[in-house]
Amino acid sequence: MPTHQTVERFVKLVEAGKGLEALDLFYAGNASMQENQATPRVGKAALRAGEAAAQAAVSDMTARCVCPILIEGDVVVIRWIFDYVDGQGRAVHFEELAYQRWAGDHILEEQFFYDPGQFKARA
């Protein structure tokens, strides 16, 4: 079960634009990550490759956690707001919920829930 301090350290890294560092420090070696109902990616190497590809496809990414962070035993739910510029130079704003299952200080499973329609450019 993660402590509030552990989860807050994770959030601060993501908000600082250090998603790969957060992944290295806080995800278990056999962790899985899933976008909505898509097939999960499994293993830290696959998660890292996916995160690196996502970061390379955008610029000016900002991430903000919307408090409160919900922590109940090994389950953590974080509401994120992201703003970035996509590969076509369009500003994109989206929100998601990250549902995480932790073991101690490491994330074992993470599933993101969001509306894919948010990925279109802002009017």
PLM-predicted stretches and their roles:
Residues 62-65, 79, 92-98:
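Short, surface-exposed coil-to-beta transition loops
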Residues 57-60, 84-93:
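Short, cysteine-centered beta-strand-loop-beta hairpins and adjacent loop/turn segments enriched
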Residues 2-6, 20-74:
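A solvent-exposed, acidic/Ser-Thr-rich amphipathic alpha-helical stretch
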Residues 72-82:
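A short hydrophobic beta-strand element
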Residues 45, 88-90, 118-123:
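A short, polar/proline- and glycine-enriched secondary-structure boundary/capping micro-motif
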Residues 82-84, 102:
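Hydrophobic beta-strand positions in extracellular immunoglobulin-like domains
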Residues 95-121:
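Short beta-strand edge/turn micro-motifs at domain boundaries
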Residues 6-13:
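Solvent-exposed, amphipathic alpha-helical segments
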